[in-house]
C-alpha cells in the first residue's frame, strides 16, 4: 500500500471558471463562447429589432421595416447618416445622449450590429480553434472560416473606414446588399477588378470541386448491402472505408488525363481554392476603400470619344457605370443636393 503525502494544489477562480466553461454539456461553451454567444445574440437581436420597427427615413429617406410595409427582401437596418462620420454611435455618446429612439433614428443599430457581428464571427472562429485543440485535431476549420471573416470585416468595416463615413457601407438587408453591389460597380468598376475575378474563380471553383467530390464519392461507394440504394450500402458506424479512392483516381484519369493521387492533396485543394477566393476578394475591397483603380483602359475611352463608330464592351460598360453614378448619386445621397445638367448625363456614342 502506497500513501502519497503532499499538499493539495489550491484552485483559484480562473480554474473554477475554466472547469465550468469546458464542462461536457449538450452545447459546449468554452472560453470562445464567452465572446461568441453574447455578441451573436445581440447582433441577431439588433437586426430583428431594426428590420421590424426602425425606419431609415432619417438616414436614407427610405422605408426599411416591416412596420412600414417592407417584406423580408426589402427590409434592412440602414447605415448611419453621412454626417455621423465614423463615430461608434454609442447609446451614451454625444450623438444619441442616452435617447434610445434618437439612437435608432441616426443609425446606431447598424453600428451595434456591425461591431457585435464582427466579434461574433471572430468568436465562432476561436471556438473552432478551441474545440480542435481539445479534441486533438488540426485547426484547418478555423483557418477556412477566416475567409468569411475577412470578407465581412473588409466590406462592412474596412471599406466605409476608407470612405467618408459609415454611410457608404452596405445596409443589413437583401435589397440593400444588391444596391451596394450596384454602387461598387458604378463607382469602382468592381467586376473588372482582378481581385474580384480571383474571388469569383475561387467561390465558383470551390462549388465545382464540392459537386465533383460529392458525386465521385457517391459513384464509388462500396456495394456491401443487398439494396441497390447506395445509402444502404454501408453502416454509419463501420470502421472500414466506404468508397474506393483507386476507382475514383482511375475514373478521373480517364476523364482529364490527370487526377489527385491521394486524399490529403485532394482535400487541401478543396480548402485552398474557396478560402483563397474569399481572401483575394477581401484584399480587393480594401483596395476599393482606398479608391485604387484597376483595369482602366483609357486608350479605348479616348478613341471612343473621338470616333463615334468605335465601341467595345469595355466602353459600353464605362457608359453604364457613368449612368449608375449619375442616377444613383442623387437618389442615394439626397443630402448632397446633386443636380446634373442634361449635357453631363451619360449617352451612347450614337446619340
Curated annotation (Swiss-Prot):
Catalyses which reaction(s): 2 a plastoquinone + 4 hnu + 2 H2O = 2 a plastoquinol + O2
CDD domains the UniProt entry points to: Photosystem-II_D2
Residues holding pheophytin a: 128, 141
Pfam families: Photo_RC
Binding site for chlorophyll a PD2: 196
GO terms for biological process, alphabetical: photosynthetic electron transport in photosystem II
Bilayer topology: Multi-pass membrane protein
Source domain of life: Eukaryota
InterPro entries: D1/D2 (IPR055266), Photo_II_D1/D2_sf (IPR036854), Photo_RC_L/M (IPR000484), Photo_RC_L/M_CS (IPR055265), PSII_PsbD/D2 (IPR005868)
Residues that coordinate or bind a plastoquinone: 213, 260
Intracellular or extracellular location(s): Plastid, Chloroplast thylakoid membrane
Keyword line: Chlorophyll, Chloroplast, Chromophore, Electron transport, Iron, Magnesium, Membrane, Metal-binding, Oxidoreductase, Photosynthesis, Photosystem II, Plastid, Thylakoid, Transmembrane, Transmembrane helix, Transport
Alphabetized SUPFAM superfamilies for the sequence: Bacterial photosystem II reaction centre, L and M subunits (SSF81483)
Nucleotidyltransferase found in the keyword field: no
EC number, UniProt record: 1.10.3.9
UniProt remark on cofactor binding: The D1/D2 heterodimer binds P680, chlorophylls that are the primary electron donor of PSII, and subsequent electron acceptors. It shares a non-heme iron and each subunit binds pheophytin, quinone, additional chlorophylls, carotenoids and lipids. There is also a Cl(-1) ion associated with D1 and D2, which is required for oxygen evolution. The PSII complex binds additional chlorophylls, carotenoids and specific lipids.
Known role: Photosystem II (PSII) is a light-driven water:plastoquinone oxidoreductase that uses light energy to abstract electrons from H(2)O, generating O(2) and a proton gradient subsequently used for ATP formation. It consists of a core antenna complex that captures photons, and an electron transfer chain that converts photonic excitation into a charge separation. The D1/D2 (PsbA/PsbD) reaction center heterodimer binds P680, the primary electron donor of PSII as well as several subsequent electron acceptors. D2 is needed for assembly of a stable PSII complex.
Description of how the protein assembles with itself and partners: PSII is composed of 1 copy each of membrane proteins PsbA, PsbB, PsbC, PsbD, PsbE, PsbF, PsbH, PsbI, PsbJ, PsbK, PsbL, PsbM, PsbT, PsbX, PsbY, PsbZ, Psb30/Ycf12, at least 3 peripheral proteins of the oxygen-evolving complex and a large number of cofactors. It forms dimeric complexes.
Extra information: 2 of the reaction center chlorophylls (ChlD1 and ChlD2) are entirely coordinated by water.
Homology family: Belongs to the reaction center PufL/M/PsbA/D family.
UniProt name for this protein: Photosystem II D2 protein
Organism of origin: Gracilaria tenuistipitata var. liui
